[in-house]
């Protein structure tokens, strides 16, 4: 087994894990309910507020799947109990964002505003016109949404204008001189 796959997942109070046929795991908590179907190379067992993962065979793929399954299960448990948050910053003259219900209106220097429809389970806040805070229980979906929003206007290397993650560092280039 992998190092990560050997570690048990501690289940906090208020969170329940159900393992159904076909390795479908459902995690219920205060914030949300998440479900995912895992590889048949691993088996889940839940006892005494601890979930453990065991291998069905010792193939290289099964060993890799054990670590992946444990990490995903841990993220699901944390997501339904605490939730995840991703912050984006918008840098550029006239660049701004505004959250309206399940849509995010972005003005990013195009001739038209960009309207991004948020998927179910993800919420957006704009405490300032140049800040976006995305929240959700599903870490994978949250990262995908943040990546798609960033993709509209990636930070450019000369002035740094664009949409970036809050903790992202953009290496700046010097302009060409004649």
Curated annotation (Swiss-Prot):
One of its GO terms (molecular function) is structural constituent of ribosome. One of its GO terms (biological process) is cytoplasmic translation. Keywords: Ribonucleoprotein, Ribosomal protein, RNA-binding, rRNA-binding. It comes from the Bacteria. PANTHER family: 60S/50S RIBOSOMAL PROTEIN L6/L9, LARGE RIBOSOMAL SUBUNIT PROTEIN UL6M. This protein binds to the 23S rRNA, and is important in its secondary structure. It is located near the subunit interface in the base of the L7/L12 stalk, and near the tRNA binding site of the peptidyltransferase center. NCBIfam families: L6_bact. This is Large ribosomal subunit protein uL6. It comes from Francisella tularensis subsp. tularensis (strain WY96-3418).
């Amino acid at each position: 087994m992998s190092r990560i796959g050997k570690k048990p997942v501690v289940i906090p109070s208020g969170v329940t894990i159900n393992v159904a046929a076909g390795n479908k795991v459902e995690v219920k908590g205060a914030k949300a309910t998440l479900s995912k179907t895992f590889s048949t190379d691993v088996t889940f067992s839940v006892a005494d507020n601890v979930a453990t993962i065991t291998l069905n065979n010792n193939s290289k793929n099964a060993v890799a799947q054990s670590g992946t399954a444990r990490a995903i299960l841990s993220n699901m448990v944390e997501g339904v109990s605490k939730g995840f948050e991703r912050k984006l910053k918008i840098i550029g003259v006239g660049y701004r964002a505004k959250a309206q219900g399940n849509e995010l209106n972005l003005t990013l220097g195009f001739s038209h505003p960009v309207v991004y429809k948020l998927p179910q389970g993800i919420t957006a806040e704009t405490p300032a016109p140049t800040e976006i805070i995305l929240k959700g229980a599903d870490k994978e979906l949250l990262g995908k949404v943040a990546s798609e929003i960033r993709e509209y206007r990636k930070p450019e290397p000369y002035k740094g204008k664009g949409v970036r993650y809050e903790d992202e560092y953009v290496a700046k280039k010097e302009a060409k001189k004649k």
